[in-house]
Amino acid sequence: MALDYLLLLLLASAVAAMEETLMDTRTATAELGWTANPASGWEEVSGYDENLNTIRTYQVCNVFEPNQNNWLLTTFINRRGAHRIYTEMRFTVRDCSSLPNVPGSCKETFNLYYYETDSVIATKKSAFWSEAPYLKVDTIAADESFSQVDFGGRLMKVNTEVRSFGPLTRNGFYLAFQDYGACMSLLSVRVFFKKCPSIVQNFAVFPETMTGAESTSLVIARGTCIPNAEEVDVPIKLYCNGDGEWMVPIGRCTCKPGYEPENSVACKACPAGTFKASQEAEGCSHCPSNSRSPAEASPICTCRTGYYRADFDPPEVACTSVPSGPRNVISIVNETSIILEWHPPRETGGRDDVTYNIICKKCRADRRSCSRCDDNVEFVPRQLGLTECRVSISSLWAHTPYTFDIQAINGVSSKSPFPPQHVSVNITTNQAAPSTVPIMHQVSATMRSITLSWPQPEQPNGIILDYEIRYYEKEHNEFNSSMARSQTNTARIDGLRPGMVYVVQVRARTVAGYGKFSGKMCFQTLTDDDYKSELREQLPLIAGSAAAGVVFVVSLVAISIVCSRKRAYSKEAVYSDKLQHYSTGRGSPGMKIYIDPFTYEDPNEAVREFAKEIDVSFVKIEEVIGAGEFGEVYKGRLKLPGKREIYVAIKTLKAGYSEKQRRDFLSEASIMGQFDHPNIIRLEGVVTKSRPVMIITEFMENGALDSFLRQNDGQFTVIQLVGMLRGIAAGMKYLAEMNYVHRDLAARNILVNSNLVCKVSDFGLSRYLQDDTSDPTYTSSLGGKIPVRWTAPEAIAYRKFTSASDVWSYGIVMWEVMSFGERPYWDMSNQDVINAIEQDYRLPPPMDCPAALHQLMLDCWQKDRNSRPRFAEIVNTLDKMIRNPASLKTVATITAVPSQPLLDRSIPDFTAFTTVDDWLSAIKMVQYRDSFLTAGFTSLQLVTQMTSEDLLRIGITLAGHQKKILNSIHSMRVQISQSPTAMA
């Protein structure tokens, strides 16, 4: 292999076309043995060329006889795999005008022919002149002719002509020369073909490659990277043209990491002490500081002991070390607050990304044991990742020893097996007043007194001596307040006026003094009427007991009535469902009306009427793209006669089906075949006369709408989403006008093509869903399966499916689209969904959903089905929004719909998360995990400090994802501020 490669290097500069000779008469040492017809025509003789070399030639000179037709046939020539053949002919021709008394039939040209065959079929005895279908190559004319024969004077003029022919497909061929009245000598014939030579180019080896069948043909030659080189981008290839010359290469190889180019044709190993990290690098580089490469061909230099390289450091950067500890710590104690200041470390490890962590430890009086501080301790600006040499610490306990470790860390501290270098400072806090009392409760009230209680301050900072209560009438101000004291955390305030509202505050006292007053809270004394009613409180108790008994009896009666009505509704629902199948409806003039295929006595007749039968030979199945209820779904191609080939989706009926399953399967085609609308999936036809039975529809490249939106979360504008909704509404308007009720309208049943056009699909299958109890989407109801989250309440309760119930489902689809495929009602159970809807709760607006769109959703979710908009009205409303984008700028909020109770999805308890990974998983943004960790946001404490600029800096550019993450960070901050046990 190495020897072959060296040979290629020697040939690399010789890139001219190669010619491989198949026959050359100049090298013949004996008779050529060609066949002449007639025998008096061509004659083989020995002669001399212009250099007086002996050669075998053929000559003919019957110019004085008319009607000459002299043929000369070569022996069989093997083509050796060549597709195009070149013939070089050297000949002399006598000038007809130099011949005395020559008739007018004298010629100065001859014809060249060839005949392609797989074997030797012509001999001197059988030349098949009359049978052979010779193919003419060209008429050969002399550029120069001679008039005298004088070899001594060198007056003979030799012509050289080259002709090519092809394509050739047989094993070989014959050449034939036809003379029809010339005086000429055929001095030599060379037959050859061309090929592009082996070459090394762009660090790739290309083999010898034969030219194509035509002079304009380009033959692709695949290249192989030379040793220690690898392809870049597209596979490397060269084109060999018809002249045996290489064209401009496509793709390239480059030396792989650890190897550098040598004279553009070889890759040599980087010597020890050098490296090359990537293919793109030009050559080897010396190892950066504090690193080495003891062996050849190193793609990276390893760091010396005690030095490291951060994950985000490129190989070209010097290895660095961890910093030394901070210096010269100064502490300032103010009661239960501390300010720490320090100088940067003497040694930064060669890096400029030094930050500081503060480790707080609360100790016993003798400092023999310490424990981590609780989460109530506050650090400003933060505890971890400090960039400045100063921190303010508050909310400490009074009279308490603390130890603070100030760690210096940099980008490689996590690589070191040793803990970060730090400096410790021991501090004891001073005495301090107690913290604020968090809240007060009213225990009881009379006309002239109020009894209150409250919890102890979270930080008493010593023994509580007593409490001071300040109170005043709300109509006055605190300058007219009165004071009371209590030795315990309860107090009764007397001497108040009846029916008045009082503002009350409380504070605790220790030996260090009073703490701050609590927040203002209002309490009211009883009025005279309130007091009298309390005296009569026994009477309501008796009345309440009696009322409870009455309610119990009424409840029993009501349950009996409801059960009777449900049975009645059940019967009505069954009959109304059947009646709908036979309803003709009243459509617009000239509008087709949907015909239920199950009204046919023979359902196969409906298939024949509404679906076109396709010959299975026109269908080509390529790959599985899903599985349906009845069998697998494939992507394939359909080529009908006289039409272009198109991609299609192919639903198949699985083997072993019953006749009922076949009928149910084909009913969808009978339904779909009646529709013709740009927002309804188009039926191409069915295959019923072979197995498997197929339904063939147009192919939608982006698949189901719900999964498509989840894959592209936040990547579409509001106008684009409204455009999708408008298309779905237009398709449903068409179905409603045909009196067709879909029953299973959901984003999963909307398909999206490559132009983002949405089309309604999945017709008729909702009636025949299998009893798969593992699928929570569909729930049993009155003997059938219903997609509860998408279904109108009257359809759930009474199976009353109408276009109005489809409008309800369309409202849910709107919510799915605006939330980018979120599951309606989240993780609520189906029964909880039914209960919430019965109590008039509705879904809240998705994040950043325009108020106008959410209002349209609420209109679709009207309990009274007659109050819901029709699909024609929905289309008009969406058209107005598209024409007036400003109407979509107002974002909906839950508080903006006071008349309509909305469900509120609970925010996750972020304080329960311990890692950034857990948090990202909870908000479904786990794809950014590496971005957070690489940028140094390794704890939730650091994450809570992030801004929109930080998100951009770590590579989160999608506006929707930024908003989702920032909203979560905001919620996390709120929870941390409200939780006494939030993360540090």
From Swiss-Prot:
Q: What is its EC number?
A: 2.7.10.1
The tissues in which it is expressed are: Preferentially expressed in brain.
Gene, per the UniProt record: EPHB1
Q: The SAM domain covers which part of the protein?
A: 911-975
Membrane topology, from the record: Single-pass type I membrane protein
Q: Which reaction does it catalyse?
A: L-tyrosyl-[protein] + ATP = O-phospho-L-tyrosyl-[protein] + ADP + H(+)
Question: What does the function comment of this entry state?
Answer: Receptor tyrosine kinase which binds promiscuously transmembrane ephrin-B family ligands residing on adjacent cells, leading to contact-dependent bidirectional signaling into neighboring cells. The signaling pathway downstream of the receptor is referred to as forward signaling while the signaling pathway downstream of the ephrin ligand is referred to as reverse signaling. Cognate/functional ephrin ligands for this receptor include EFNB1, EFNB2 and EFNB3.
Which residues does the entry assign to the active site, renumbered to this chain? D744 (proton acceptor)
Domain Fibronectin type-III: from-to ranges: 322-432, 433-528
Q: How does it assemble?
A: Heterotetramer upon binding of the ligand. The heterotetramer is composed of an ephrin dimer and a receptor dimer. Oligomerization is probably required to induce biological responses. Interacts with EPHB6; transphosphorylates EPHB6 to form an active signaling complex. Interacts with PICK1. Interacts (through Tyr-594) with NCK1 (via SH2 domain); activates the JUN cascade to regulate cell adhesion. The ligand-activated form interacts (through Tyr-928) with GRB7 and GRB10 (via SH2 domains). The ligand-activated form interacts (residues within the catalytic domain) with GRB2 (via SH2 domain).
The residue spans the entry assigns to the Cytoplasmic side of the membrane are as follows: 564-984
The protein's name is Ephrin type-B receptor 1
